[in-house]
Amino acid sequence: MSKQIRKNVKKPRKKIYRGVVYIQTTQNNTIVTITNIKGDAVCWSSAGSCDLKGRRKATAYAAKLAAANAAKKARREFVLKEAKVLITGPGAARDTAIHEIHKAGIKLTILREKSGVPHNGCRPPKRRRV
């Protein structure tokens, strides 16, 4: 009895023409996640996954790299054409990330600021005495 040879055929991925881009910026890192309309994550990238470590992750250049990686992957593999952008966090690199997503060829329909504002939040740390 001869063995049957099975070919590794990749399953074609579904094309997503509309999606949502979540940009989460913190003081230390930037994370860009691209989802479909339902909210299922399609691809993501972060400054740390772009081989940047330590304080370099907090720069605008790192956010640019992360956004470009995620956007290129979404355009190449899932044919993403237009997206809503939801931005969270106080980081400095938000504008750079948005600009890079637009440069990758994704049409931005809505820009929405989603950062949480505390209603008097946590107690601040004790004042430093020197």
From Swiss-Prot:
SUPFAM superfamilies linked: Translational machinery components
Keywords, sorted A to Z: Chloroplast, Plastid, Ribonucleoprotein, Ribosomal protein, RNA-binding, rRNA-binding
Record GO biological process: translation
CC per GO annotation: chloroplast; ribonucleoprotein complex; ribosome
UniProt keyword rRNA-binding, yes or no: yes
Matching InterPro entries: Ribosomal_uS11, Ribosomal_uS11_sf
Any Pfam family matching the protein: Ribosomal_S11
Compartments where located: Plastid, Chloroplast
Superkingdom: Eukaryota
Main localization (coarse): plastid
GO MF terms, alphabetically ordered: rRNA binding; structural constituent of ribosome
UniProt-listed PANTHER family: 40S RIBOSOMAL PROTEIN S14/30S RIBOSOMAL PROTEIN S11
Similarity remark: Belongs to the universal ribosomal protein uS11 family.
Description of how the protein assembles with itself and partners: Part of the 30S ribosomal subunit.
Name of the protein described by the UniProt record: Small ribosomal subunit protein uS11c
Source organism: Stigeoclonium helveticum (Green alga)
Biological classification of the source: Eukaryota, Viridiplantae, Chlorophyta, core chlorophytes, Chlorophyceae
Gene: rps11
